[in-house]
Regions:
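Generic marker of residues within folded, mature protein domains
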Residues: 7-9, 61, 136
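Non-cytosolic coordination micro-motifs
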Residues: 20-53, 87-189
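Hydrophobic beta-strand residues in large extracellular and virion-surface proteins
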Residues: 58, 69-71, 82, 153-157, ...
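Sec-dependent N-terminal signal peptides
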Residues: 4-16
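A sensor for short, sequence-defined functional sites
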Residues: 41, 58-59
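Mid-chain, structured segments of secreted extracytoplasmic proteins
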Residues: 60-105
C-alpha cells in the first residue's frame, strides 16, 4: 500500500512539474522553435527585419509604441528570451512617464517587482535637468525586475547602443527554457 501511495505521489509531482506554463509575450508562449515564434509574431502585425542563427529582429507595435523586438533562442533553437527596445524619447519627462506606465502595467499583471531602483548618482539628481546626460554617462539606475513561476521580466532604462540615447528596454526570460539552457551549459563547465 505504501508503494502505491508513493508511486501516486511521484506521478503527481511529475505531472505538476510538466504542467508548468511558459512565460508569454503578446499572449504567445515563449517556447518552440525560433521560426515558429517569429511566425506567430508576424501574424500579430510584426515585421521580420533580420533573421540569423543567434536570433531574429522584428519591428511592430507593442504597448502603443513602435518597437524593435529581438527573439533569442537557446543553443538547441528553442525560443527562451524576447527583448523589446523602445524608441528614445526627446526628453526626460516622456521617458520617465513611459517607465512608470510600464511599471504600473507590469505590476498589475505580475505583482510588485522583486527589485526596483530609481536613482541618480551625484552630481546628478532627478529634477536637475541633466537626467538624460546622467543616463548616457551611466550615472543613473532605473530598473525593475518581476518574477513569476513562468519567468522573469526586466524593465530598464539604458543607453540604446545604436543611437547612444537613453531608452526603455524590456527583457522577457522564460523560466523553463532558460533553465534548460543552463543545464546544457553546465555540462560543458
Amino acid at each position: 500500500m505504501k508503494r502505491i501511495v508513493l508511486l501516486l505521489a511521484t506521478l503527481g509531482i511529475c505531472c505538476w512539474a510538466g504542467a508548468q506554463e511558459h512565460l508569454k509575450f503578446k499572449n504567445i508562449p515563449i517556447d518552440g522553435s525560433k521560426k515558429a515564434f517569429v511566425e506567430a509574431l508576424c501574424q500579430n502585425e510584426f515585421h521580420l527585419v533580420n533573421d540569423g542563427d543567434f536570433g531574429a529582429a522584428l519591428s511592430g507595435r507593442f504597448t502603443g509604441k513602435t518597437v524593435d523586438v529581438f527573439v533569442m533562442p537557446t543553443s538547441e533553437g528553442i525560443t527562451s528570451r524576447v527583448a523589446v527596445n523602445y524608441p528614445s524619447p526627446d526628453n526626460w519627462g516622456n521617458l520617465r512617464l513611459d517607465f512608470y506606465t510600464l511599471l504600473r502595467s507590469l505590476s498589475f499583471k505580475y505583482g510588485e517587482p522583486v527589485e526596483l531602483s530609481q536613482e541618480f548618482q551625484l552630481p546628478f539628481s532627478d529634477g536637475d535637468g541633466r537626467e538624460l546626460e546622467a543616463l548616457r554617462r551611466g550615472r543613473a539606475r532605473w530598473y525593475a525586475r518581476f518574477v513569476s513561476p513562468e519567468g522573469t521580466i526586466h524593465l530598464v532604462i539604458a543607453n540604446n547602443p545604436m543611437t547612444q540615447q537613453p531608452a526603455i528596454n524590456l527583457l522577457y526570460e522564460d523560466a523553463l527554457n532558460c533553465r534548460r539552457q543552463d543545464e546544457l551549459n553546465s555540462q560543458d563547465l
